[in-house]
Every structure is written in C-alpha cells, then in structure tokens.
Amino acid sequence: MATTFNFELFKKRLNLFLEKIEDLGGATEPLTIEKPATEEEVKAVEAQLGYTLPPHFREGLLENTAHLEFWWDINDITDEDEDFLPEELAEIFCGELLFGLDLLLGYEESRKSWVEDVYPDYNNKYDRVWHNKMSFQQVGNGDYIAIELEPENYGKVVYLSHDGSENHGLYIADNFKEFLMNYAAVGCTGGEDWQWEPFYTKGKGIDPTSENALAWYKLLNINEKELDI
C-alpha cells in the first residue's frame, strides 16, 4: 500500500486523535516528540547491534525524531457505556506508539531472550518469525512490532506474538514510514494485534480507508478529510 511520508501530517493525525479522545472523556498523555538523533548516536547503536538500521527507520531517527511517545485510553468511556463501540471495534481500548533510539537496544535484548529461551528453532515455522527482526515497539501484552531483516521481505513491519496469535508474522506495512502514516491514521490503536486487526486489509496492511476505519472516524467525530487520507 504505497504511502507518501509526511512528518507534519503524521503529527497532525496524532494530535487530532488526542483531541477527539479528550473531547469524548478519554484519557491522554501529551504527545512527546524529541529532536532528531545525530549520525554519531545512530552509529553507536548500530555498532552494538552489529548491523546498519533499516533505511526508513534510520532516516526517521535522523530527520524527524529520536524518541516519540503517544498514548490514549478509552476504558473510562466504555466502562460507562458498554455499547459505545460497535461489535467490529469492541476490542479497542487504547492507542500507543512508543519508539526511540534509546529504547532499541533494550527491546532487542528482550526479543533475543524470547528467541533463546522459547523460540530457538529457526526451522520451526512459528519460531522462525522471531528470528532476524529488529523490534522497535514493545506491546503491553508482551508482543512486539518489528522490522523484518530477512532479505526476502527486508524492511517490512511485522507483528511478533508470544502466545500463538494468528497474526504472528503478519506484515502490517511495507516499511517503517508507511507504518507510521497508516498507524497514525487510525490513532495508533493497539498495539495489541486484536485492537488494530479491524483495520487490517490483506495486501495493504493497516488500512485507513477500510470500512472499519471509516466507522472508527465516525464514532470519534473525525472527518476523514482532516486526516488527509
């Protein structure tokens, strides 16, 4: 799903969702976007990882931000009104995007621990998904969102499940920048897979033009033109 990266539009989408969630009575945290990383800072982390970061991720750190935090929660709304969410969106309760150069080594240490302790067999189809990835976001339930390092699908964004989800190994964007744009366009719902799954379209990944995405916008009083989809 070809998507043009526009950092200003990306930030606009994040702020719009925070505004709409607040209007409905949900909880939010201020959007945190730190200054870009330096080439020296990136190379220092790459030296410890033993490889060059995937290009879209690397460019994002150098050109846009070295650390970003975005979060909202609607549990208070759904506790008060159990029918607030339609059935197809009923699993949604929060949104989060949290990545940073400063977090990368810790995330990778944790992912590698899963590989060593639980999923060591590269010849096992499920285990193999955990291998040769670069995790950039740790999901609250223990899963990860990562970037593929295997040559065949290098650079794609992939979901890593620790507990047998059918979405384990699912590619949700062709690259990191596409992921940012499309994930922001649905409010970074998740990151647990069952929260963003309603917006997944086979062959497109997270799809802000999907029927469920349009229903989500309507629920939050968002005009899709505001998102410039």
Task: Identify the residue ranges that each predicted region occupies.
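A surface-exposed partner-binding patch
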Residues: M1-V139, L214-I229
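Intrinsically disordered or highly flexible coil/loop and linker segments, enriched in small
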Residues: D23, A27, G142, T189-D193
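A short, compositionally biased
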Residues: H131, E152-Y154
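Compact, glycine/acidic-enriched structural inserts
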Residues: S161-G187
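Broad, structure-driven detector of short, well-ordered beta-strand segments within folded domains
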Residues: D143-E150
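Short aromatic-glycine-(Arg/Gly/Cys) micro-motifs in beta-strand/loop hairpins
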Residues: G155-L160
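Long, compositionally biased interface segments
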Residues: L180-I229
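Active-site donor-binding loop signature of nucleotide-sugar glycosyltransferases
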Residues: Q138, L149, H162
